[in-house]
Swiss-Prot record:
This is Small ribosomal subunit protein uS14. It comes from Bartonella quintana (strain Toulouse). Binds 16S rRNA, required for the assembly of 30S particles and may also be responsible for determining the conformation of the 16S rRNA at the A site. GO terms for molecular function: rRNA binding; structural constituent of ribosome. It holds the Pfam family Ribosomal_S14. GO terms for cellular component: cytoplasm; small ribosomal subunit. The lineage of its organism: Bacteria, Pseudomonadati, Pseudomonadota, Alphaproteobacteria, Hyphomicrobiales.
Length: 101
């Protein structure tokens, strides 16, 4: 199990990303638009830099929903390889069976 504080910190980051997503996208579009004057683009980049760091999507870490483990994460299932193996062998994940040949 991951530390509860690390999992909670990641949840707060996810919420902050959702809260600032529209504002960040709007400012980023202004900064990237070559048709807008350089002064306006610079103002937008300053405003973008003033946003909280944790509102950036890259600061969020994919974590297992079951254990909170940050590594060996399967995106489709939103869980780590260890949780996948444990829950799959018990039969809690539909369509997952232990292979044998």
């Amino acid at each position: 199990m991951a530390k509860v504080s690390a999992v909670e910190k990641n949840k707060r980051r996810k919420m902050m990303v959702m809260r600032y997503a529209a504002r960040r996208a709007r400012l980023k579009a202004i900064v990237m638009d070559q048709k807008i004057s350089l002064e306006e683009r610079f103002k937008a980049s300053v405003q973008l830099a003033e946003l909280p760091r944790n509102s950036a999507k890259v600061r969020v870490r994919n974590r297992c929903e079951v254990s909170g483990r940050p590594r060996a994460y399967y995106r489709k299932l939103k869980m780590s390889r260890i949780a996948l193996r444990e829950l799959g062998s018990v039969g809690y994940i539909p369509g997952i069976i232990k292979s044998s040949w």
